């Protein structure tokens, strides 16, 4: 048999050319230790800060992910997002090459999700078309637009004294059980029909409390435009820490497309505690109150993402699909104080980051003044420019009346005989205080709130018994709705009052007062 070298070379050549060799390069490491939801990994060379790491799946096949937070010389410290009991020393960990992402878009509206955007309400999967990273840089100064549109909460005391604008960060601060969540939920309920999408982030709360909030939103018909992100007290510290950023990314979807969104963080004190726990377990050096050194940055980078962005930003982001529209993300962070101490570390941090605060007091709450807002130290630094003309013109004297009333009431306890002017001021203050009371889940429209403020401003309530003030108010609302619907519609549409409307409203309130017994 004759061997032909040329033939053999040709055969080898064709075999080499037809070889389909593929190599899969993976960056992987080994678990060195696992404890308290913290995993130390050796051998991950090209891992990014905040990168998602893939761990062995659970027994039922659910993928397990972690977040790379500590990048050290010879190891990586990672927090596990979810269950970690099945992870053992020696397990293989793979880099994903991706920063943590959550699903975004209108598909999430009406759903309850966890910190990773996975549904937990038993209503089936969420088929979101888009996803985005949870950590994003806030819009720059040039991309922003000044806050000049109101975000009505429907609460008389807030909309008149501490108005909130679209794109503002307004802190709600107070001790436990002072009605902080109630104020935020009322603000969400009042956005019905106003084209504002809402995100409610529950951090470290009892599952029963979250369930009650969802039920309240459903009963008010507010779940249709709301996403609830729940990281309950039973979940890991890592999930509680991440949840606020996940919710913010979901809210930014609407802001970046020329829409308005409202996000409530309930509450950031628990997020700071969760972050402190994660940091201490990662052996980062503790600082004041055992919080890590970057706890200010934890909240500032989150709250700076709430902003009003200009038309150019929206146009550039949507590549020209949306033109001539501004977008906004309004944040209502909640902070819980201990015994009214607003000078503690986390409260002072968040007060300095936000554009104002609504301070709720236990003493006022227990006295039946609800919402229990302390008008003296509650401020809105930018909301005044966004207040509607109608409310702005009518609410000018309310804060002054209340401040003077509180001061005089303290002196009046010791004085036996008071002059006429002082007595008048005390009577007026008592009526204004009574008038600012409002039951939960009953937000007011701009026109009805305007009518109430008009009645108290023009002295129509000066001779009404203090105990009957709220009855007078509800009776007036019903009277105006029934007999002066065109006037109320005009006030609602214009958000301002001309001389004709003022004359008509004066006549209407006078007529109602005669019929009020």
UniProtKB/Swiss-Prot annotation:
Location, primary (coarse class): membrane
UniProt keyword Membrane present: yes
Keywords noted in UniProt: ATP synthesis, ATP-binding, Cell inner membrane, Cell membrane, CF(1), Hydrogen ion transport, Ion transport, Membrane, Nucleotide-binding, Translocase, Transport
Annotated site residues (Required for activity) in this chain: 378
Top-level division of the source organism's lineage: Bacteria
Main enzyme class: translocase
EC number: 7.1.2.2
Reaction catalyzed: ATP + H2O + 4 H(+)(in) = ADP + phosphate + 5 H(+)(out)
Membrane topology type: Peripheral membrane protein
GO cellular component terms listed in the entry, alphabetical order: plasma membrane; proton-transporting ATP synthase complex
PROSITE patterns reported in the protein's UniProt record: ATPASE_ALPHA_BETA
Cellular localisation: Cell inner membrane
Listed GO MF terms: ADP binding; ATP binding; proton-transporting ATP synthase activity, rotational mechanism
Binding site for ATP: 174-181
Pfam families (UniProt xref): ATP-synt_ab, ATP-synt_ab_C, ATP-synt_ab_N
NCBIfam families associated with the record: atpA, PRK13343.1
General function of this protein: Produces ATP from ADP in the presence of a proton gradient across the membrane. The alpha chain is a regulatory subunit.
Family label: Belongs to the ATPase alpha/beta chains family.
Assembly and oligomerization: F-type ATPases have 2 components, CF(1) - the catalytic core - and CF(0) - the membrane proton channel. CF(1) has five subunits: alpha(3), beta(3), gamma(1), delta(1), epsilon(1). CF(0) has three main subunits: a(1), b(2) and c(9-12). The alpha and beta chains form an alternating ring which encloses part of the gamma chain. CF(1) is attached to CF(0) by a central stalk formed by the gamma and epsilon chains, while a peripheral stalk is formed by the delta and b chains.
The protein's name in its UniProt record: ATP synthase subunit alpha 1
Organism encoding this protein: Polaromonas naphthalenivorans (strain CJ2)
